[in-house]
UniProtKB/Swiss-Prot annotation:
InterPro entries: PurM-like_C_dom, PurM-like_C_sf, PurM-like_N, PurM-like_N_sf, PurM_cligase. It comes from Lachnoclostridium phytofermentans (strain ATCC 700394 / DSM 18823 / ISDg). This is Phosphoribosylformylglycinamidine cyclo-ligase. Belongs to the AIR synthase family. The keyword ATP-binding applies. Transmembrane segments: none annotated.
Amino acid sequence: MDYKKAGVDIEAGYKAVELMKKHIQGTMRSEVLTGIGGFSGAFSLTSFKDMEEPTLVSGTDGVGTKLKLAFILDKHDTIGIDCVAMCVNDIACAGGEPLFFLDYIACGKNEPEKIATIVSGVAEGCKQSNAALIGGETAEMPGFYPVEEYDLAGFAVGIVDRKKLITGDKLKHGDVLIGIASSGIHSNGYSLVRKVFRMEKEALNTYYESLSGTLGEVLLTPTKIYVKALNSLKTGNVEVKACSHITGGGFYENIPRMLREGVTAIVKKDSYVIPPIFHMLQKDGSIEEQMMYNTYNMGIGMMIAVDKADADKAVSLLSVAGETAYIVGEIQDGEKGICLC
């Protein structure tokens, strides 16, 4: 008996590392001090001397059961983008600049080519957010995961000058809410998605005119990364007073998280375009509207609050940055929470 017969192929692990190196190297920043394959990753902070109080911000998350679609369709090149997005978008909500990222892949069987493909998506997400992929772990766990399945999670660290932390404390009556469009369902609520739609390859490969693509393509569309969009507001001297990444819990759970006590968010449902996939999901699943807004982003992946005088400028800057943004409501005095009308 040996380790390989027990289900763990060390040589496959070495091969996977070699295959993923080219993807990782494309994410490197000058501040990275260590190479691939060490016990830890090191990142220098000396280039941030202009900050009065350099403050680290962090985020960790996974992709969740969206992975099941990747398994069914045998498509693994974009799921890593979702993993990065779920972490760096949270950092961006605090005003942070992502610095580096680490991934964790646990699988039933280490297939080097598949692992490298997954990491290529992680690397793409890192490039989109200007974060260095400085480390990771691939754990082969036979008997724990089915041989064709894996789990994917990650951890990101960013930096912000403490005085520029986005906390919501400056919110006042009359501030404007701007919603930045999502790319689709993103990475939450897929347990419900999988109950509504038939999770078979034939069904997922069915083309729908209303979706302008197959169901599988639309459901696997990567989570949008908003780092560069929010950076465009910084460079354009627009102060973001509050920011919310609309993930699990939808509008009702996430928007209140960006508010201080004593203010409420008034959001108008008819102020923006809801993507067709949400209408299809709601109809086919007979899901109540409130449940939809309490589960999904409903077409708004990031919500920000700015001063009324900056609202039009913010929308314009976001447009130049390649985003679709809508003025969707305002902040009013009242009990902390959200009014969807």
